Swiss-Prot record:
Keywords: DNA damage, DNA repair. GO terms for molecular function: ATP binding; ATP hydrolysis activity; ATP-dependent DNA damage sensor activity; mismatched DNA binding. This protein is involved in the repair of mismatches in DNA. It is required for dam-dependent methyl-directed DNA mismatch repair. May act as a 'molecular matchmaker', a protein that promotes the formation of a stable complex between two or more DNA-binding proteins in an ATP-dependent manner without itself being part of a final effector complex. This is DNA mismatch repair protein MutL. The gene is mutL. The keyword DNA repair applies. Belongs to the DNA mismatch repair MutL/HexB family. GO terms for cellular component: mismatch repair complex. The keyword Cell inner membrane does not apply. Residues 351-406 are annotated as: Disordered.
Amino acid sequence: MAIRQLSETLINQIAAGEVIERPASAAKELIENALDAGATRIEIATAGGGKALLRVSDNGSGMDAADLELAIRRHCTSKISETLEDIRTLGFRGEALPSIGSVARLSIASRKRDSAGGHEIAVAGGKVLHLRPAGANPGTIVEVRDLFFATPARLKFLKTEKAEAGAITEIVKRMAIAFPAVRFVLSGSDRATLEFPATGDDHLARMAQVLGKDFSDNAIALDAVREEISLTGFAGVPTFNRGNSAHQYAFVNGRPVQDKLILSAIRGAYAETIPSGRYPVAVLSIALDPALVDVNVHPAKSDVRFRDPGLVRGLIVGAIREALARDGSRAATTGASDMLRAFRPGFQPYGQRPQAPWSAETSPSRPYQPAPAFSERPQASFDGLSTPTARAEPQFSPDPVSPGLASPRPVAPETVGRYPLGAARAQIHANYIVAQTEDGLVIVDQHAAHERLVFEAMRKALHSKRLASQVLLIPEIVDIPEEDCDRLMLHAAEFAELGLAIERFGPGAIAVRETPAMLGEVDAHGLIRQLADEIAEWDTASGLSAKLEYVAATMACHGSVRSGRRLRPEEMNALLREMEVTPGSGQCNHGRPTYIELKLSDIERLFGRS
């Protein structure tokens, strides 16, 4: 068969297959055009999930008759001229309108601000139906009907109307986040009207509109610069996380992208603070010279290619980690709201309530008494952060990492307001510390909190090369499968840097000769078995630092004060004081919250006093 030139309509339909995959793709292109035209108000209306109708109206600069005639031709654009090295607009290829016009019924009515009247052009299946004068307000109205009527095979690949409408909503949300100074309105026959009023330069207010007040209450501001690249935005505290990555938003020079490099950097920044299977919530905006990024690498312009990807990744990871360290003792405020919903009592007459038998141990009228002294058996303790237990002989003098825990001070009632986490008032179920704050109370998970403190102390000592070890008087022998022994011995050098000295002890056995001094007495058998299981899943490409911190987190869990252990009031207060000055203390090493805060106003609502 001879080679021949394809018709313009067929060329546009081929292009539409790449650019216009679904109604949301068309909505994205039309909203980008409106933003490039300088619009401050954009209204989107849909019907049938955008398949029957998609209308985008704006108050931008508008077009005259000559512009309209060119706008529906392929590769006609006002946004670039001779180079792709300086793209400062969202659109630039001149493909969207001709692609849409080739597969749908398209009409565009537009009027320039300084013109007395407007014009309208109509296209169906790639054929121009008319170009004529029309009454129009300044700006542009683009109406798309019967999307893919000219290529009916494409309709079979679309999802339900509800799913397609949801995809359009997500596009509008992303655009609204990127452009807070623009008012967005989304309406449709199959949806309630969604409106985002303009917030000017107040990005956090726009976040609250789009992502909800929960995000704005749990967000930490980002503002960092590295060389010629700047990063702004907001990152959620680690305990404010979700079950998928749909709540991660990235923008490059105002362009919404779903770039793998950026998403990977976000995961890396939260690697030590969020449990497996959970995802952080973040909104990142990267600004850089257009010459340093290629936006012409994907038909939908959703991916970009940075000239220096390592610099961008380092900027993102560093900025988020610095922000978390700066404000890292915060925990998500949503936990208190969830607790309020769970505990809000339904009204029930007193006489109809089931009566539990009275017990001296459980009665609320039993006066508070200090917890009994610890058992004589040595355990992980707060002092263990800086003092080895009696059963070990330190190899060299331990570094006093946490003086606040080693020298606890009582908290007088009148000084409660000086401390963010308040003063300990009780321990319940030998696991949770109840503290009174100036305007409410805090409930602390003692094991999760101490685990984080131990981990941060180990990491600090590790980075300063002053991590003390303790020589065991009698080495602990741990029997494990031979393949686990092999894996452990491959990483013996990494363990040694953390104060854990191991060696072979015959077939299927490991001898533990030294443990980190700050952990006190450690369950060596449990620790070694857990390490053997976990290092089997290590990424072989991970650096030494990442591996050491991974091991430190596991050790911290085994060396922390356990659930079920009674604490004295001064020990509880010591834990609270150390949490207040320790980065990341709002969540444990597995990403769970270490404390929940209840405001006095929340408590009063429980009793109907608000």
